[in-house]
Amino acid sequence: MIRTHEAGTLRADHAEQNVVLAGWVARRRDHGGVVFLDLRDASGIVQVVVREDELAHDLRSEYCIKVTGTVRIRPEGNENPDIATGEIEVVASHIEVLSESAPLPFPLDGNQEISEEARLRYRYLDMRRPETAEALRVRSRATYIAHEVMNDNGFVYVETPYLTRSTPEGARDFLVPVRLQPGHWYALPQSPQLFKQLLMVGGMERYYQLTRCFRDEDFRADRQPEFTQIDIEMSFVDEEDLFDIGEKLFTRLLREVRGVELPRPFRRMKFAEAMDRFGTDKPDLRFGQELVELTDFFANTPFRVFQAPYVGAVVMPGGASQTRRELDAWQEWARSRGAKGLAYVLVHEDGTLGGPVAKNLSEEERAGLAERVGAKPGDAIFFSAGERTASQELLGAARLEIGKRCGLIDESAWEVLWITDMPMFEKDDEGGWTSVHHPFTAPAQEVADTFHNDPGSATARAFDLVMNGYELASGSIRIHRAEMQQRVFDTIGLSKDEAETKFGFLLEAFQFGPPPHGGLAVGWDRLVMLLAGQSTIRDVIAFPKTASGADPLTGAPTPITAEQRREAGVDAVPEQATS
């Protein structure tokens, strides 16, 4: 073998041992004829002392080398407590260059700011940086733990196809041409949803998979066209069973990766309550500043803007001290989110109200507003008025922005909860109904017989798991009865013929005694991001793509040649069936 020890594993009890190490030159320092090298491998860094100049004469940063030498205790006063090998050093007797390195496009040591484009272009170099390497190791540890949890709870790991048929799941499919059947296409799965339900029909009962999913979505920050999720499905269960396995997984991960003990059972909050209090279905509970509804308070207001179906407010502590430019910036912030603006009132130190909105309020409203919303002298009150959901969402986003700007968020806290009683349907762009989760989600038991009569108020047996403001898992109890499934299809405007064309294989399977079943999927990239203490999922993916879906490393996506296009049958039109 090339080496006898890993560099980062050497300690004082290795003193006087002869060792052979291999790794990269992380740093070189010359001191009066003696050269000090920081030798790095995957295990860490060790200092190598080179007393013969010819051994290190040609060495440069990131040369890959093999070092033969003797471990010794560092001279007193030269210890380095910042590294695990800081008590010792290796005195080199021989150095072999295994491979040389070209000049680096960016430094790998220190805290220099490096553009993300450069990091992704040279991802293999970025991985040599401790922060990137540690994030990937956290992902590996978390993956191992997840497999242990699922195995300990009797789950069977089953791989589902990556080449399947296109089915409507809310986003566009990535399509793959079939060379042997010109004009026909596979689709890469947006999720294994249909296959995992078929596994329940097949009697597997407890299935899980760490799987890749593919969605051809519009460009969005911190989204990837391919991503990983832990997919779980169980037969003969209700919501409590799904909550139980989800909590077992999350508590074990937080305990073993971060040393954090999450109390069980996790908190639960209905969707409607989350929207009313926080303006979002993924509330960050690490700080307060809850929304306050003022619809009744302004029921008789002379201010036309507040004569709306919903009026709400959120308080910004100390916000009255903002400059006019800062307050104007809030308006731009709101407009960037599709709102007309963000009305505000400033609470002066004497308790009087200022700002453009204050003069439009009645004397009674001005007198009682601060107390109603819990504002103190020096605070600012932001308002949103209009349609309920849109107004709440704007205030929810403002609340989060306030938390960040005012330093209200406890970055050391871990707040997790289940959001339950999710809406079953929502309006689409054409004014029809569409499923919020997917069309196989079961309705709440109290509306099981009537949901089709009033889709807008129907709730589903669906839930999300939220941690620190991030949705990390989503699940539901599924429909397993044909009559109920058809009513859902009818509600979303899917005819029997269309349903048969798109989901016929699943509907056929449901004729053979399907069990009651349910499941959930965990967004693995985002969960690992939190576990690793990173701010973007790109930092916990080995070879991520940019927000525009590009891969700076390989140059993907790329055009294909005319020959590839012809051979794949990209332009072929399938023969139409004749009657």
Curated annotation (Swiss-Prot):
Catalysed conversion reaction: tRNA(Asx) + L-aspartate + ATP = L-aspartyl-tRNA(Asx) + AMP + diphosphate
UniProt keyword terms in alphabetical order: Aminoacyl-tRNA synthetase, ATP-binding, Cytoplasm, Ligase, Nucleotide-binding, Protein biosynthesis
Location of the protein in the cell: Cytoplasm
Coiled-coil regions listed in the entry: none
InterPro entries: Aa-tRNA-synt_II (IPR004364), aa-tRNA-synth_II (IPR006195), aa-tRNA-synth_II/BPL/LPL (IPR045864), Asp-tRNA-ligase_1 (IPR004524), Asp-tRNA-ligase_1_N (IPR047089), Asp/Asn-tRNA-synth_IIb (IPR002312), AspRS_core (IPR047090), GAD-like_sf (IPR004115)
GO terms, biological process: aspartyl-tRNA aminoacylation
The enzyme's E.C. designation: 6.1.1.23
Annotated region (Disordered), positions in chain: 551-579
Family statement: Belongs to the class-II aminoacyl-tRNA synthetase family. Type 1 subfamily.
Name the UniProt record assigns to this protein: Aspartate--tRNA(Asp/Asn) ligase
